[in-house]
């Protein structure tokens, strides 16, 4: 399943990823990892203000 994920950074810049396949935190809880159909993003948690995702991923 692909869904939309929005990441807002502490400097109020944002990125919207339309074709997210999965997301989660690294084992040490310092990185946020996002896999899309085209790319893999690894973002330090200290740079993230908040994360929002499409609610359809919770409908199972």
What kind of region is each of these model predictions?
Residues 28-42:
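Short aromatic-glycine motifs in intrinsically disordered, low-complexity regions
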Residues 1-31:
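N-terminal acidic leader/helix
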């Amino acid at each position: 399943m692909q869904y939309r994920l929005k990441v807002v950074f502490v400097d109020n810049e944002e990125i919207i990823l339309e074709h997210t396949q999965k997301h989660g935190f690294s084992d040490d809880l310092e990185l946020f990892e996002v896999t899309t159909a085209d790319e893999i993003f690894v973002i330090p948690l200290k740079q993230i203000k908040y994360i929002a995702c499409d609610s359809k991923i919770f409908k199972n």
